[in-house]
UniProtKB/Swiss-Prot annotation:
PANTHER family in the cross-refs: PROTEIN FDHE (PTHR37689:SF1)
Biological source species: Salmonella typhi
Keyword set, alphabetical order: Cytoplasm
Protein name (record): Protein FdhE
Top-level division of the source organism's lineage: Bacteria
Gene Ontology process terms (BP): protein maturation
GN (gene name): fdhE
Record's function text: Necessary for formate dehydrogenase activity.
UniProt-listed Pfam families: FdhE_C (PF24860), FdhE_central (PF24859), FdhE_N (PF04216)
Keyword Nucleotide-binding part of the UniProt annotation: no
GO cellular component entries: cytosol
A molecular function GO annotation: ferric iron binding
Subcellular location(s) of the protein: Cytoplasm
UniProt-listed InterPro entries: FdhE-like_sf (IPR024064), FdhE_C (IPR056796), FdhE_central (IPR056797), FdhE_N (IPR056774), Formate_DH_accessory (IPR006452)
């Protein structure tokens, strides 16, 4: 991997002197992630053919905000950071890190928060999850992390992922130390947890003009240079697609080398764009990319593939 997190006690003067350079990682700022996402989803739901589903996703994002403050996480990750650094692995690697029962507590709290807002099939889904055993929930979590989407129904997956994401984001926000970029690439996966991005964003503010990929699990953002495929790192056959015009705030970056695409959002075109919400609200663009023969290189946390997809 090309971005490592250095334990705090190993930071030397060389790391401290690079403070004015491009930040390789932006850890999640949980104070505004979920509220902002919920607000953006509700805003995008207006005059959108997917309006009902966007409002449904907004309910989940709002519930995540409530549960975040009802169930804070206290955890010392110092030893974990050091061990992962020695191994050259992401510190919160989804394929290695043991899960404790905190994530299931978050899931049941999310269900309790959402139940009064749900009806019909959605209510039946969360009631089914409410009755599931700890072992069944762990099996579903492991299947999602292994990209075994056929083993978890696409209507249950967003709720399971919402709890896992909240748990991983809480852990990511507690990481002590500092990220350091190293030679080499291999940045298609999150350097913190090893999950995939949901989309990428060209930012404004202190990171003006820089592109960051946004993790679909732990909410961390990591820097990847522009005009380079985020999946295979080639740059010779990239194209940009939109349903509006060249000034569109949401585009798809396609790569002819690997045949995939990832959404790229531009804050300078619309400061309100949000990595998850704007990706979900632009599924018409996904349909166009599929027609053009490109496969999506990311997963939106509110939209998982069903069996056979």
């Amino acid at each position: 991997m090309s971005i490592r997190i250095i334990p705090q006690d190993e930071l030397g003067s060389s790391e401290k002197r690079t403070a004015d350079m491009i930040p390789p990682l932006l850890f999640p700022r949980l104070k505004n992630v979920y509220n902002r996402r919920a607000e953006r989803l509700r805003e995008l739901a207006e005059n959108n053919p997917l309006g009902d589903y966007l409002r449904f996703a907004a309910l989940i994002a709002h519930a995540q905000e409530v549960v975040l403050y009802d169930h804070p996480l206290e955890m010392d990750l110092t030893a974990r950071i050091k061990e992962a650094n020695d191994q050259g692995k992401p510190p919160l690697d989804i394929h290695v890190l043991p899960r404790d029962k905190h994530w299931q507590k978050l899931l049941h709290s999310l269900i309790a928060e959402l139940k009064p807002e749900m009806n019909g099939p959605a209510l039946a889904v969360i009631e089914n999850l409410e009755k599931a055993s700890e072992q069944e929930l762990e099996q579903m979590a492991s299947a999602l992390f292994a990209s075994d989407f056929a083993s978890v129904s696409s209507d249950k997956a967003p709720f399971i992922w919402a709890a896992l994401s909240l748990y991983w984001a809480q852990m990511a926000s507690l990481i002590p130390g500092k990220a350091r970029a190293e030679y080499g690439e291999a940045r298609q996966y999150c350097p913190v947890c090893g999950s995939m991005p949901v989309s990428s964003m060209v930012q404004i503010g202190t990171t003006q003009g820089l592109r960051y990929l946004h993790c679909n699990l732990c909410e961390t953002e990591w820097h990847v240079v522009r005009v380079k495929c985020s999946n295979c790192e080639q740059s010779r056959d990239l194209h940009y697609w939109s349903l509006e015009n060249e000034q569109a705030a949401v585009k798809a970056e396609s790569c002819g080398d690997c045949g995939t695409y990832l959404k790229i959002l531009y804050q300078e075109k619309d400061p309100k764009v949000e990595a998850v919400a704007d990706d979900l609200a632009s599924l018409v663009l996904d349909a166009r990319m599929e027609q053009e023969g490109f496969a999506r290189s990311s997963i939106n946390p509110f939209l998982f593939p069903g069996e056979g997809e």
